[in-house]
């Protein structure tokens, strides 16, 4: 809230888009983002496809990788379409998730990043979760949902 008691609104919100479970967590984040977005603001859905190491990529048909990217693009478009009347953009990146999401947020001029978290597994204790890395390194507010 501002000092006058009015709710703080955001001009540019980046949502880290998870597409498992038909994008249910991303759809929930989009619904929440709509309540936080300033009139005329922009929501950017960012999905990161893990980079396939070169030695593995050589054995995967290019058609398979292209088909996966089209599938992700279609899923993001469907989710974006559900936010009727809102300015929603979609971005697909390849690479390390937290760095890619932070880069997309910088490019979008985001003043809020939204990301879903999960209950930590054993690997999260050793290498850390994407959400934790984003919270530590983001130069803007981060809203973590479960």
Regions found by a protein language model. Name each.
Residues 137-146:
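Short, flexible loop segments at boundaries between secondary-structure elements
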Residues 62-74:
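A short acidic, glycine-rich active-site loop
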Residues 35, 81, 106, 136-137:
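Solvent-exposed polar/charged
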Residues 115-133:
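Glycine-rich, Arg-bearing micro-motifs that act as flexible, cationic patches
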Residues 3-59:
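Small/aliphatic-rich secondary-structure junction motif
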Residues 44-46, 89-93, 143:
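General small-molecule cofactor/ligand-binding pocket signal
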Residues 37-39, 84, 139:
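Short conserved AdoMet
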Residues 1-9, 81-113, 120:
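Structural beta-alpha unit
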